């Protein structure tokens, strides 16, 4: 799954939810 780095929220296929998404 993609997890927002430094965020608790998970990326739902959208990178706009965070600056950088990393493979979790």
Swiss-Prot record:
Keyword list, A-Z: Disulfide bond, Neurotoxin, Secreted, Toxin
Main location group: secreted
Compartments in which it is found: Secreted
GO terms under cellular component: extracellular region
Cysteine pairings via disulfide bonds: 4-18
Tissue: Expressed by the venom gland.
One GO MF term attached to the UniProt entry: toxin activity
Organism domain of life: Eukaryota
Residue ranges crossing the lipid bilayer per the database entry: none
Signal sequence annotation: none
PTM section of the record: Contains 5 disulfide bonds.
UniProt family annotation: Belongs to the neurotoxin 02 (plectoxin) family. 02 (plectoxin) subfamily.
Function text: Potent toxin that may paralyze and/or kill insect pests such as H.virescens (lepidoptera), S.exigua (beet armyworm) and M.sexta (tobacco hornworm).
Name this protein carries in UniProt: U1-plectoxin-Pt1e
Organism expressing this protein natively: Plectreurys tristis
């Amino acid at each position: 799954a993609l997890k927002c780095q430094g965020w608790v929220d998970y990326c739902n296929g959208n990178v706009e939810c965070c600056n950088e998404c990393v493979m979790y």
